[in-house]
């Protein structure tokens, strides 16, 4: 899977907006948090959304159509389709596979473009299936919510978890941190998650799933902001 994505990553990159931060070189959760903090300082309201059981509900036919639009090599497509169907026939991707991370990121890229080009909030960022919109109008965000729910259901066959719409000054829980217009604090619950992630990184390194350089990079990323 790593060899496949080393070749295909540049092709996928061309589909992504600037402010989507998962599974991309030079991005990551901490840059997503910094962007959200910047917007929280300059916008009054936020709308936080999350896809319900995202990986489990990725539709294979829709994903394959998206891949067919950006890749023209039949052998390559056949290989990717086999990987997709190896988990189940109609929908769902295994969370642990590297290809699944890229497929999942690509699946929502159409939504990213819809939000930025059609809805035009004051700010927008996405980390996999967690995303935030910013605006100075609560009414505008409610309208955007309706549009996004319809887009996800009709175009992607996805539904959203209950939304959170609030004032930035009251704080935004995002990727294990509480972001306000003044500062960024680590959520208490995320300390336990950090330990779990560290154990996972150590396991992957000790069992030769990742290189030493990648191990160091991920540990630094985990404990820095």
Predicted segments — roles?
Residues 2, 142, 159-225:
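Right-hand nucleic-acid polymerase module
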Residues 3-8:
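Active/ligand-binding-proximal structured segments within catalytic/core domains
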Residues 10, 14-19:
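Charged boundary/loop elements
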């Amino acid at each position: 899977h790593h060899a496949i994505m080393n070749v295909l990553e540049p092709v996928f990159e061309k589909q992504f907006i600037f402010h989507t931060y998962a599974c991309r070189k030079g991005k990551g959760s901490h840059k997503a948090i910094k962007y959200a903090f910047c917007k929280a300082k300059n916008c009054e309201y936020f709308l936080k959304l999350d896809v319900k059981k995202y990986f489990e509900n990725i539709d294979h036919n829709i994903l394959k159509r998206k891949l067919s639009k950006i890749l023209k090599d039949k052998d390559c497509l056949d290989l990717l389709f086999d990987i997709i169907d190896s988990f189940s026939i109609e929908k769902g991707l295994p969370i642990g596979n590297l290809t699944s991370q890229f497929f999942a990121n690509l699946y929502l890229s159409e939504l990213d473009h819809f939000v930025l080009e059609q809805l035009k909030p004051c700010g927008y960022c996405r980390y996999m299936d967690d995303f935030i919109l910013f605006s100075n109008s609560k009414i505008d965000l409610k309208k955007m919510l309706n549009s996004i729910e319809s887009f996800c259901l009709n175009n992607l066959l996805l539904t959203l978890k209950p939304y959170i719409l609030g004032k930035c000054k009251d704080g935004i829980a995002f990727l294990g941190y509480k972001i306000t217009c003044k500062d960024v604090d680590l959520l208490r619950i995320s300390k336990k998650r950090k330990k779990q992630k560290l154990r996972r990184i150590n396991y992957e390194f000790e069992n030769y799933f990742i290189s030493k350089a990648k191990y160091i990079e991920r540990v630094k990323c985990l404990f820095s902001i």
